[in-house]
Amino acid sequence: MRLTRRQTLASAAALCAASPAIAQNTAPPPQRPLFGAQHWRLANGLEVAFIPFSRAPVVTQYLFFAAGGAEDPAGRSGVAHFLEHMMFKGSPKIGVGDFSRLVAREGGNDNAFTSRDVTAYHQAVEASRLGMILEMEADRMAAALIPQEFLESERGVVLEERQQRTDSNPRARFREAFTAALWGRQHWAGRPIIGWEDEIRAISRDDLAGFHARFYAPANATLVIGGAVPEDEVRRLVDKHYGGITARAAARRDRAPAPSQAAEPRLIRRDPMTRDALFLKAWMAPSLTAGERAHALPLEVLSHLLGGGQGSRLHKVLVETGLAVSAGTGYDGDAAGMTEFYLSAMPRPGVTPERLEEAANAVIETLIQQGPTEAEVARAIRQLTAGAMLALDGFGAGPRMVGGTLAIGLPLDAVEFWPARISAVTRDQVEAAARAVLPSAPSCTAWLLPAA
């Protein structure tokens, strides 16, 4: 599972929304870097960051590749995710299935994830074993075997994963259809990361090997080390194990522009497997890397004040009045391309879809017409920055957030000084961002309903 900087901080900010005392008493120094990461690049193009962490004698390695589901070839959705699975099927130094076994033997753990923008592999071990995991990861980066004899069995694993997580889950099916309705079924942002079933079945070893050859190069990767190891030792070991990998030109993300309108502006799905209705609405929106980038940080503040838990406008108007069981918003500005600003709500039993949708639209319209209050903006920023400090408590948060930021092409300062940047957002900027996106950006409104 991928947790972006926004998702990591948003989960902590939600805790602050539920507990105002935390937000009041946890304010970050405005110009102090969150992690104090050291940052350099090897001669072959590999970007490296190191985050000291001395609370426990452990170390973690995150290796991000700037290629996710959005980079899947046309007609082959799911290649990036399928390759993630096949990367555990051996390399010149590591036998099939031995990677995780060797990490576990040292008392560590490992995993991987694929998102729309990146594929990442990570391990955590006792600090003295850093060299071991660097050597193993560098080996499969340079020369993963991707053996043909394991292709069909792993395809079965991927298809079973899709069956369990999506096909047998009415809400997951609905959300998948909703994303495709907004962007288009074959647009890079509209395809599921795991892939459409028919396209998963068509993926060949050549597809996987070609993706590896194109994207799994040092100049297309970001390595983040966090832990209780001296910096000079980290530099020595990284250069020893990764420095010899042949340099290749970085692959460019080749993505179509955002469509001028939603593929399906309105989507209604009835499902006999669902009991509770679900309302979704999403707008295409700029990010920190695409579109009107100046709106990205204000949109983060807007998302929190509009639907960031208790005290937000949607919670007050929909949940506290008894119209909805839950209501919230989401926005991920940390994206390598255009992204979405979305709203979700579940009506209480007895509340009609029409009534809930009308109330939600009224909240949006009022915000567009009147803008947020200074108090709302200040409260949202206070909770978001407090959430940033709470996120520092987790051992893996730093490498995950730093790596995810660098891998989409943003500078290190974008995450290190995020509290200061978000604190500088003004009420007028939030109002301008809301008016730039909510009234006119391509959008999709959708309902999942029980069978009639």
Model regions: which residues?
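N-terminal export signals
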Residues: 2, 7-24
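Cleaved targeting-peptide boundary
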Residues: 24-30
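Mature N-terminal segment immediately following signal peptide/propeptide cleavage
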Residues: 32-60
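M16 family metallopeptidases and their MPP-like homologs
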Residues: 51, 56-80, 96-141, 171-198, ...
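Active-site SXXK
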Residues: 77-91
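Sec-exported extracytoplasmic/periplasmic mature domains
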Residues: 87-92, 104, 108, 135-146, ...
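An aromatic/glycine/proline-enriched structural segment found at the starts
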Residues: 185, 189, 193, 218, ...
